[in-house]
Amino acid sequence: MVKHILFFCVFVWVSTFAFGKESKLYGPDGKLCVIVSDEGGMPSYSVLYEGVTFLQKSPLGIETNLGDFTQQMALTNVGQLSSVNEEYQLLTIKNSNPQYQANVQTYTFSKEGKKIYDIVFQVSNHDIAFKYRIYPQGNTLCCIVKKEATGFVLPKGSTTFLCPQAAPMGGFARTSPSYETSYTVDDVIGKNGWGNGYTFPCLFKNEDKGWVLISETGVSSAYCGSRLLGKENGLYTIGFPQEGEYNGNGTVSPGMALPGETPWRTVTVGRTLAPIVETTVMFDVVKPLYEASQEFQYGCGTWSWIIGGDNSMNYDEQKRYIDFSADMGYSSVLVDALWDSRVGRDKIAELADYAASKGVALYLLSLIHISEPTRPLYISY
């Protein structure tokens, strides 16, 4: 009898992992759908728009120094459905008065009867944002996140528009990865850039069905910024910084106090590029960390280097750009690299006085953060 009971318990445990549970969350207009599952003990999600698959079943989960929470997991609770309806002002983007409407649901994943983390999903008409909320384990009130299983599986036939990330400590003054590499256009899936993944945001085309934009938002000092790593079979996963960045100082594995939260991972879906271009999800799901001490006024400016490069760094050309800014009604000029040697400190002060007479301010490039000991550190006008 004991053997029969034991067999039954094992069968139920295996069956639960094999078949799993799933839950669907729709955007307000009912077109965008996220399906969250724990089939096979593996947390996952998929994304459909108007019934068409834009992300196939994609992995979720994290691995920490407290354990591997990417497998043998169970979806033990689906929170009550709620909604967000917010309007805010942001004067530095094309849509200065975004209105954000989304449906919200929290999915609790457990292991061996213990709650490990919630995954909070917010789904609007074209945007998905999700993050992990990690629970303390007994008296352990902190952890190190070794890696995220968080992934995005693109359908077969998808193509990519991605910016490969450079290896660390190379390029100009050893500043790479400086996120200035060229995008590849309409390339096949299954690559990993130059071997180091890709820089957000990452754009994909789902054949003739539409577009997918993958990115992140809400990154603070409590976690690290991430990149996207290309794998096989259309899978792309979250990757932490490269070991050699910042001369190898520090760790690439974020540590966090518990309970703690990760940044938001975002997915924007559209039949056309319009929802991709118009999305404000990177602002919609975050709140200001603090109130500004004053109301800052933003303005337009000019920059010679983007057109003329290093050769444009001379007194006469910078004066011409000051005149150009004044004629256009712009408020500033960015004076880029080499101004200290090609214009000089005395002449740059003269330029600053001339600019002030025209109602134009100068921003002078400072290279304190990179390997340029001959460059000035603190000079501004």
Task: Identify the function of each model-found stretch.
Residues 257-324, 328, 332:
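An acidic-aromatic substrate-binding cleft motif
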Residues 22-278, 282:
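N-terminal accessory beta-strand-rich subdomains and adjacent acidic, glycine-rich linkers
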Residues 1-22:
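Bacterial Sec-dependent N-terminal signal peptides
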